[in-house]
Amino acid sequence: MTAARTSAAKSRPRSRRGEGESLRDDLLAATERLMIETGSADAVSIRAIADAVGVTPPSIYLHFPDKNSLILAVCERHFEEFDAVVEAAGKSTHDPVESLRRRGRAYVRFGLENPEPYRILFMTRAEGARQYDILAGAGGRAFQHLVDAVQRCIDAGAFRPADPVFAATGVWTAVHGVTSLLISLPGFPWPDVDAIVDHVCEIQIRGLSQTFDEPEEPS
């Protein structure tokens, strides 16, 4: 261990009884900050997190068994907040199509009002088992709520019969595309943001509402 790291590790006094939760929060905050700075969960190391908080790596393992658990905890916390915001918007009306439209608006608004958490959830690279764990956990619940919203539109006859998972994936990619562009290119001369979001949502809704003729068999 270098002298600098030794100094950093000693800079945080030993937690008193009952202060472990404070250290846990500090670890999550440092992990989140490093993920944003590096743009990749893979680039964040236990050593870097320990140095940022001013503790030794073994102190981290008292709260999290490995780096993957830290990354998941950060993502789950933001996914829960994100899901609550979008769900509240969707439940503000009984009309299933308007509910889906409001979910789309809330999705984009969350990203614009919380760009750094949004980057962590949807714009940092996560691969392999970690990505599966995140999507199957809190992220999976958020996506299932979108699938359910699409299914309600189908059940009401507003959308043509379709695979709700496939349809929801299309809606997600559309609103994510708008959100990520707005976050990544703030200097671009965008037209009215609300109008853009409504336009994209309307394209998705109309596409799912239309009945397409079956293509003719080639002669």
Question: Model-flagged regions — what are they?
Answer:
Residues 20, 24, 71, 75, ...:
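Amphipathic, non-transmembrane alpha-helical scaffold segments
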Residues 77-100, 131-140, 151:
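Amphipathic alpha-helical linker/stalk segments
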Residues 26, 37-69, 73:
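Helix-turn-helix
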